[in-house]
Structures are given as C-alpha cells and as structure tokens.
Amino acid sequence: MHSFSTLPNHRIGLYILWTIPVLFVIFKLLAPAKCSLPIVNGRRWFEIGQYQARRRFSLDGRGIILKGLQKARAFRVVSQKGPKIILGPEYANEVKSHPACNADVFIAKEFHAHVSGFEVLRPQHVMKDAIRLKLTRSIGALMRPISDETTLILETQWGNSNCWHELDLKSTIAALVSRVSAVMFVGEELGRDQKWLSIVTNYSSDMFVADLDLCKWPEILRPIATYFLSSCGKLRRHIQEAALMLDPILSEGNSTHGNKQNFLDWFEEIAGGRKYNPVLAQISLAAAAIDTTSDLIIQTLTDICRFPDSEKLQEELREEMVRVLRADGWEKSAMYNLKLLDSVLKETQRVKPVVVFGMGRYVTEQITLHDGTVIPKGETINVVNTRVWDSAVYENPLEWDPYRFLRRRDSGDHAAHLVSPTPDHMGFGLGKHSCPGRFFAATKIKILLCHILLKYDVKISDEASSKVVSSGNFLFPDATLRISVRRRQENLSIWD
C-alpha cells in the first residue's frame, strides 16, 4: 500500500479533483437552507462588506422597514446586528404560537447570552414565574408603598417651590422610576442606595453599547472579543459590584423586613430548589422595569405638554384622578377607572412605540407560513409593529389623540386597554411571550403620573425640540428635553 507522499503527482491531482466536489456536496447538505426572501437594504455594488448597509439601517431603520413593506410582506434587512427576516403584522398571530418559533433561544442568540458580561440575558424562568405568580397578584398591596416612595422622591428631587424651574426630563424620570422599582424589588435599604441604583440603571444603557460593539465581530469570536472590549468590561464590573452589594443581604437568609416582601423573598420561594442566580435575576428585572417604563412616562409627559390644548387636557386628567382616588383610594379598581389616563398612555405607546419590530423568534425547524412563505431552520424572525401607523386601522394615525382609546373603550372595545396587546398595537408584545410585568408597569406608571400631574404644573418650552430619535429598530424620546415644573396646591386628602 502506497503512502500519499509516494503516489505519482497525477494520481494526487485526481484525488484532489474528486475530493473538492465531494466536500462541496457534504457542506451543501449540512449547511442551513438559504433564505430566498428579498433583501431591501443590501450593500451597493461598489461597497465591500456590510458596514455601510448597517450604518444606513442605524440612521433610518424605520424608513427602511416601511419601504420594505411596500415591496413585500416578508423580506430581509441588514440591521446593525446583521441580516434579519422581517414579517408583516398579518403574520403576528401565526408566529406568536408556532411551536418552531422560540423566543428564549432568540433572546439568547440576539443578545449573546453565552458571552461573559451578557449572562443577565439568559432565560430567567424563576424571574418570569415570580412576576406571574407573585408580583401581578401583589399589585394591590404594592400600590400604597409605590405612592409613598414617589412622595419622598418628588419632594427631594422636584421640590416644593411654586416658581417655575427646569428639570432634565430623561434623568429625573429615570431616577424616579429606578428608585421606586428598586425599593419594590430589593427593599428600602438597598433600593435607596445610590450605588445600587447606578449599577442597575447603567447596566442597561451600557449593554446597548456593548451589544453593538460585539456585533462588529464574527459570532464565533465574540466569546473571546468580549475580553478585549472596554464596553463589555463595564458589564462584568456592574455584575461583580451588584454581587458584592447583594450577597450580604442574601447570606442573612431572610430579606424580609417586618411583613413586607420583595423579589428577594419571591425568587427563593418560587425557585423551590431550582438553580438560579439572584444577582443576574435582579439586574435583568431592573433593566426590564426601568427603561421601557421611563420611556413611556417621558414621552407621555412630552405629548401632554405638546398637545394644542394642553392646559385643558391636564385639568381633565386631574379631575379624573381626584374623582377616582377619592372614591377608590389606592386600590386596583382605581387603576382600572383612570380611563382617560389609560387612553393617553396607550396613544403615546401607539404613536411612538419603543421598537419598530419585535416578537423576535429563532426558527428551530423549517416552517411554511399561511401564504406559502418558507422560513428556513436557523433563521431569526421579527414581526413589525407598523399597524400603529396604518390609516386602515387608526384614523389620522400620525396624530396624537389622547381621547382615541377612551372612545374605543366606551364603545365596548376591550382591546382599548393599555395592557391588552393585539396585532394592531404590540407595545407589550403579543401572546404568551407578551410582557409578563405589564400589569405592574401600568400600575406604577399611573401612580407616578398621578403624583406628578396632581402635585405639579408642567410645561415644555415652545422653542424646545421634542423630536423622536430613531436608531435602527429603536425609537427614543428626545434625550435633551427639559421640562418646567412648579408646585401646585392639591387636595392632600387623596394621599391619606
């Protein structure tokens, strides 16, 4: 038997010629099926790589998506994070319950949950169960503590002056939301600690930067690249610092003070022996609670102040708040009966949602959708939330109408409630993976806005910019906006 090195050159050449097509066939058989959907913002003929296509998406993601929907109902885009499949809203009900469309795997892959610093994004089933089984059922008991904490924060940060004074809207609302949330999640001592608040607040914003930095690297190199990127190093430091602060409380074996319970207790109870990381769970919980809640409050206050008849709207909201709170107090029924406020919030979430597309799913097996559209195994898909701007669904869709959902609710439309997601309004997602904490979030937002509007007059300068900032898939309120406030003389009996 000849060794390969002793074979004649012509026979070596024949082996190579036969090997290449065999390997090609093997690779073709093992490789994922190629997606045939059109790509709407690919690289131009003179461009090398996808850098410019990604940059264009970063600058005008919403515009690219809307143009894509004019050409096809299912297509691909080159996003800041690479190629994605985008589906029209008519696929929402199909995707939400399809067994081959996995939300947990999508989140893990989309946000590098296997990479150091991003462990917070790993599926947190204990957290989801605690929200569903404990938090949602405890909303009534938490309303008074939320109100009391809001009072303390506003007195310190907004003051009691009856003269107009300006506040940075983004930072003051983020501080309010983060502290109220933290006190409910980890108790008063840690929840009021500025270092803890800084950690849980900054992790989310720093993760956004680190995520985009990491996406510039090939996926196979990201577990290594994370150790060379300063933005990823920040995430690891946040986690380490959070552990140093939380571990002493956890080591006591009892986080409960008096008869008050918080998520530290609920996690242990719900875990029931299941393995979980309480530090990662707390950071994940805070990130979910702070960003979207702050976003909605900031944009709602902006919309109220920008409304042509702002003073009249503010008085109508205050009249409703006083009437309802006098009748119901801080009970769950009060939140249900704040119908105008609910309409205002849902309308703000409609006109400026947090994202253009959501419902991210990883396709575990090739699927064929109702119209014959084939999605290969291994692809990630997203469903657009663009019906919120569709004139076939909403009259004058680009106009902010604070009474829109109040009219719909009065006509018997049960989907007009803030916490009721539909394919026409997916602000909280859709289906079994819709935001599990939306009931708590809606309650917290309403309580905070009751305090703000009843205790303060608010306005925004006519000269101030309040444009929505688009960055890829995300829509952000204007981060530079300042709000003017002054203390009002409200009926204090409603806070008793």
Swiss-Prot record:
Its EC number is 1.-.-.-. One of its GO terms (cellular component) is membrane. The keyword Transmembrane applies. Its cofactor is heme. It is an enzyme of class 1 (oxidoreductase). The chain crosses the membrane at residues 12-32. Keywords: Heme, Iron, Membrane, Metal-binding, Monooxygenase, Oxidoreductase, Transmembrane, Transmembrane helix. Pathway: Secondary metabolite biosynthesis; terpenoid biosynthesis. Gene3D superfamilies: Cytochrome P450 (1.10.630.10). It comes from the Eukaryota. GO terms for molecular function: heme binding; iron ion binding; monooxygenase activity; oxidoreductase activity, acting on paired donors, with incorporation or reduction of molecular oxygen. It is found in: Membrane. InterPro entries: Cyt_P450, Cyt_P450_CS, Cyt_P450_E_grp-IV, Cyt_P450_sf. Its main location: membrane. Pfam families: p450. In A.calidoustus, the austinoid gene cluster lies on a contiguous DNA region, while clusters from E.nidulans and P.brasilianum are split in their respective genomes. Genetic rearrangements provoked variability among the clusters and E.nidulans produces the least number of austionoid derivatives with the end products austinol and dehydroaustinol, while P.brasilianum can produce until acetoxydehydroaustin, and A.calidoustus produces the highest number of identified derivatives. Belongs to the cytochrome P450 family. Cytochrome P450 monooxygenase; part of the gene cluster B that mediates the biosynthesis of the fungal meroterpenoid acetoxydehydroaustin. The first step of the pathway is the synthesis of 3,5-dimethylorsellinic acid by the polyketide synthase ausA. 3,5-dimethylorsellinic acid is then prenylated by the polyprenyl transferase ausN. Further epoxidation by the FAD-dependent monooxygenase ausM and cyclization by the probable terpene cyclase ausL lead to the formation of protoaustinoid A. This is Cytochrome P450 monooxygenase ausR.
